[in-house]
């Protein structure tokens, strides 16, 4: 009997040891000269926390190994490989700024392979059990309730009141509101202190400037800033409350409803951005509601919902410049969700959104003298690769390549200014920031990319490392990027303030503001809570939910995740590594996209079945489906 127990538990015990060892490496590479004294820098497996982690892993593996062997599948294996690679790369780049932890000396390759195995085991096991949760009885019992109109209104009001309670302390502490660089730049553009351009959405710039001017007319600039904060906050609260309402309609269990309300009301990123004059809070709220209507129109089509989708779609496009890159593909994919009778409406919505967007950006903007945004904003990846190349191989550049680079960027300072996790210092050297329409630029860009490609052929590894170093935190939840310059915007930018001469200042005591700053930073560093504000968490959640739908062979539902996937891809070419502000829309979407998983697990009839959609199409043209957005 004892022999059987030993044989049965031998594999999980060894697996737990390998995983514990993998988590004990610091990320520093070990070369051939590493002495025993320096091993503590490379490996730290002693201490209470390491012992506790090993005991916990041992219990989990021994208890869950049989179930893991029974339910594991190839989809989980693939995801586990992706997650493990992300963790390894994140560890290496966070610690060293390169991939030496993976591909250093020969010994190091063996160490990294062992770490990969340890990470793989826990990821594979975790994914397998995560996908089993919806099949469990307690989960099924929580689903499938019948919605009631009174309760629906109650949840809408509860969400609204909770957000008012959770956000108001931030707004009061930083009265009249923080104005970070991005927000102040928009105000400066409106007031004529800077050229009128579309670096930030110009329509939103006009709205912000109009509210500022109205407040100044009524009282003072402080009141104008407060007016922007209050108007934007009111819209955001309404959007998020409507999302909770949709969740209730979809028969989401109460724990998802409560969790979503708590997320929106009390996770500090929401309150922290509510008090700031910046586009991100408004954009995130609008695209979150857009995604809710998008899912709802898949559940049950109606003309009214198509109108809501159009209005929200164009709002997304006008609150962030890359919004069109999320909205248009999602509307094209909507065509495949609906049966023939409804597809024409998806096509009409897509055409109307695109036509309105072109009318605003290509018609109204030039007529009003709005200059287009600089093209350098889209070139973070190649600019970072060039700068890293010059840092690593400054002598391996030909005269013609140097000339081509220098026409576009300041060649002499690129290597010095290069920040592996933030492309802004390199982009600032772009020579055509204020003259993007110069006819010479197109020719210069062709020469630059010829040089860029020639250098890539000589040292491709540098380019790969530059990209990995600028993106690892989007793939690894456990290492926050170092290029963020502060996650929250608790300041009034003095540089932009001087340009327009706007007299704005905080009215609250600095001690209270310090408490809120400290609270936000502690939240980010707290075990468990910090993962809520880690960009990599939402890349993983997106892949987990998509993987579950693949296992269930619900291929059409995977298309619903077009918006999160496109947002993640945009993050990967963004200027900052692991910035949660860029991943914020995916955060808000993921915490109610779980309703799709619930719908799949509960076995409820849903509109992803064509017959159900067809039934709603027939009835929607006669009856009004829903009267609230």
Located regions from the model:
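Membrane-interface anchor segments at the N-terminal boundary of transmembrane helices
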Residues: 35-51, 223, 227, 469-561
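Specific aromatic-rich, kink-prone transmembrane helix
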Residues: 121, 191, 282-299, 313, ...
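Transmembrane-helix motifs of polytopic, lipid-linked glycan transferases
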Residues: 121, 227-250, 289
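Transmembrane-helix signature of polytopic, membrane-embedded enzymes
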Residues: 156-158, 240-266, 284-285
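Extracytoplasmic catalytic/substrate-binding loops of multi-pass membrane glycan-assembly enzymes
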Residues: 174-188, 195-211, 218-223, 585
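Short acidic/glycine- and proline-prone juxtamembrane loop motifs at membrane-interface regions
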Residues: 272-282, 319
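Membrane-interface alpha helices of multi-pass inner-membrane proteins
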Residues: 306-320, 352-357
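Membrane-proximal stem/loop segments at transmembrane-domain junctions that anchor or position
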Residues: 369-507
């Amino acid at each position: 009997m004892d022999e059987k127990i030993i044989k049965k538990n031998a594999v999980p015990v060894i697996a737990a040891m390998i995983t514990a060892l993998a988590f004990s490496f610091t990320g520093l590479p070990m070369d051939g000269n590493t002495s025993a004294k320096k091993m503590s820098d490379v490996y730290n497996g002693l201490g209470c926390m390491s012992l506790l982690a090993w005991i916990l892993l041992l219990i989990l593996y021994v208890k869950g190994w049989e179930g893991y062997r029974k339910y594991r599948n190839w989809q989980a294996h693939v995801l586990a490989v992706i997650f493990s690679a992300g963790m390894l790369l994140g560890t290496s780049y966070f610690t060293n700024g390169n991939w030496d932890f993976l591909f250093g000396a020969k010994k190091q390759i063996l160490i990294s392979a062992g770490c990969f195995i340890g990470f793989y085991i826990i990821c594979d096991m975790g994914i397998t059990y995560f996908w089993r949760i919806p099949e469990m009885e307690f989960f099924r019992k929580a689903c499938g309730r019948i919605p009631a109109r009174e309760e629906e209104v109650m949840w809408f009001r509860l969400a609204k009141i909770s957000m008012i309670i959770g956000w108001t302390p931030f707004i009061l502490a930083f009265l009249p509101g923080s104005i970070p660089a991005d927000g102040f730049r928009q105000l400066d553009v409106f007031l004529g202190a800077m050229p009128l351009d579309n670096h930030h959405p110009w329509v939103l710039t006009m709205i912000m400037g109009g509210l500022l001017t109205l407040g100044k007319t009524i009282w003072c600039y402080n009141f104008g800033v407060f007016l922007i904060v209050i108007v934007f906050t009111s819209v955001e609260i309404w959007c998020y409350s409507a999302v909770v309402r949709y969740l209730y309609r979809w028969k989401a269990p109460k724990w998802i409803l409560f969790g979503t309300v708590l997320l929106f009301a009390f996770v500090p990123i929401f309150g922290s951005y509510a008090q700031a004059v910046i586009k991100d809070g408004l954009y995130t709220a609008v695209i979150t509601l857009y995604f809710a209507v998008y899912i709802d129109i898949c559940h049950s089509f109606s003309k009214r919902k198509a109108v809501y989708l159009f209005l929200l779609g164009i709002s997304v496009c006008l609150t962030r410049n890359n919004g069109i890159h999320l909205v248009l593909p999602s509307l094209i994919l909507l065509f495949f969700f609906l049966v023939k009778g409804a597809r024409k409406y998806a096509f009409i919505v897509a055409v109307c959104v695109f036509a309105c967007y072109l009318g605003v950006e290509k018609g109204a903007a030039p007529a009003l003298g709005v200059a287009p945004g600089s093209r350098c904003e889209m070139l973070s990846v190649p600019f970072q690769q060039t700068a890293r190349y010059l840092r690593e191989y400054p002598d391996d550049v030909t005269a013609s390549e140097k000339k081509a680079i220098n026409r576009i960027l300041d060649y002499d300072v690129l290597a010095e200014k290069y920040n592996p996790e933030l492309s802004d210092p390199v982009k600032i050297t772009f020579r055509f920031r204020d003259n993007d329409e110069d006819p010479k630029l197109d020719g210069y860009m062709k020469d630059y990319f010829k040089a860029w490609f020639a250098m890539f052929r000589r040292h491709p590894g540098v380019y790969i490392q530059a990209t990995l170093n600028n993106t690892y935190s989007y793939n690894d939840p456990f290492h926050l990027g170092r290029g963020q310059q502060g996650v929250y915007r608790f300041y009034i930018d003095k540089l932009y303030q001087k340009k327009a001469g706007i007299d704005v200042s905080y009215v609250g005591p600095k001690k209270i503001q310090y408490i809120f700053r400290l609270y936000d930073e502690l939240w980010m560093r707290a075990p468990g809570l910090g993962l809520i504000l880690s960009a990599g968490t939402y890349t993983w959640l997106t892949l987990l939910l998509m993987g579950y739908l693949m296992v269930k062979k619900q291929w059409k539902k995977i298309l619903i995740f077009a918006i999160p996937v496109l947002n993640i891809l945009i993050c990967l070419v963004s200027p900052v590594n692991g910035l949660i502000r860029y991943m914020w829309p995916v955060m808000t979407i993921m915490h109610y996209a779980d309703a799709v998983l619930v719908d799949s697990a509960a076995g409820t009839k849903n509109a992803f079945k064509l017959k159900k959609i067809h039934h709603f199409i027939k009835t929607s043209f006669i009856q009004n489906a829903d009267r609230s957005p």
